[in-house]
Amino acid sequence: MASKFSAGLALFFLLASVAVLIAVAIVQVHKRSYESPGLRYGIVLDAGSSRTTVYLYQWPAEKENNTGVVNQTLRCLVDGPGISSFGQDAIQDQKTWNSMADCINRTKQAVPLDLQSSTPIFLGATAGMRLLRIQNETASDEILRSMEKYLRSLPFNFQNASIISGEEEGLYGWITANYLMGNFLERNLWNAWVRPHGAQTVGSLDLGGASTQIAFTAPLDEGIGTEGYTRVRLYGYEYNVYTHSFLCYGKNEAEKRVLAALAQSSSSTTVENPCFPVGFNTSMPAANIFGSPCTQQPPSYDPGQQLHLVGTGDPAGCRAIVQSIFDLASCHGRANCSFAGVYQPDISGDFMAYAGFYYTAAALKLGSSFTLEAFNSTAWAFCSTNWTSLKENYAIREIYLKSYCYSANYVYTLLVEGYKFTADTWNNIQFKKEVKKNSIAWSLGYMLTLSNMIPAEAKLLRLPMDNSVFAGLLFMFSALAILSLMFLIISLVRSCY
């Protein structure tokens, strides 16, 4: 009887010791925490054709597969036109500089003082400066130098101030759209960043003031080669991205081309515009239209000549004049051709349309997804509405409201006649401004790409218990388990005799 009791007691201590050992090991391994080395910051100035926007991004100092996990923490719009307008109006220039300083001060307040000197700051100028460089390279260089001088005077770590290419702008926009949609990384059940299983990328459609960009993944066409393709590596994976930028086909510059076509076909300085609503009239100097490198000046061009524009509210006439500025004939009878003779692989998959595309859809009171038929009928009704009714029914500033009939017809022509979206593939487009409170803009993709250059710092491992305590518990309960096992064996042997 005593031997059975001893054996039972030994078995109890053995099982208890093993259970405690397992519990201690689980706590030590699974309850460990990582002490992050903290956040890092980056600043991007998006110097667009119509305005400058300051973005502040942050990411953990440790990175996933060599690319930082970046989030937008601040977005500040600089009042005034884009930097390409510097030097035209001294008073306006000063207002723009003052507003830019206000935005920079907001970033100073957001970035901890001890991290400001290591926080990189970049300026990327887009189509407005690309046009100015074509028109006046000396002026564009002077503006970039003045911006660099200003950025170097700040407490941040200046990296560069440059004009990015249209293809880079399109690629960075594609990276932004897919990053925000979670197509590169997502958090799993253990709160770790992983690549989504079977993730598909979305194409991006960007409509700025002076250029428009399209980008999407597509297999390389061996018969064409690598024209328009870029291979990009993000979060440990490679992607073949087709991207193209059309300079002078941004919403504002394309409207100047429409106005130029109307003015040159008019026999007087009074110009009927089918894209302006009935009841809207305005005057402007010819320089506002023909001063752009995107328009062709007439033989008898007088910059100061006043042109009187009269709205006729004709949706069919508006679409016809908008289509006339696209070189569609050069792609006639050619496969894989968008317009202006530019190669483009077949459209496939989902797309994210942002910037001017989004604002046009929002102005027409459409949601993020709608059919091509709904877009056409809404645009037709909008274009047929007189100026008085538009002002009463749309809470949009008049400077923008007058042009949304043109914008709607431009978006239709670009997407359907240019990029070759059909009634079916149109349904794959989402018109959005932001995702998860992050703006859809090329600047985030720019920051993600540049964060590859910023070294990662390792996390500091913090365990639930000190190593000496863990070792002591491990030794004590291991010894107890061994002794219990020995005592159990002895008890069982004795019970046999």
Label the predicted regions:
Residues 1-13, 39, 490-497:
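Helix-loop boundary elements of multi-pass alpha-helical membrane proteins
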Residues 1-9, 29-36, 458-477:
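Extracellular juxtamembrane-to-transmembrane boundary of type I single-pass membrane glycoproteins
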Residues 13-20, 47, 478-482:
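Hydrophobic alpha-helical cores of multi-pass transmembrane domains in eukaryotic membrane proteins
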Residues 27-37, 188-197:
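A short acidic-Thr-Gly-centered motif at the start of a beta-strand
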Residues 42, 56, 80-114, 122, ...:
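Helical "lid/coupling" subdomains associated with nucleotide-phosphate turnover
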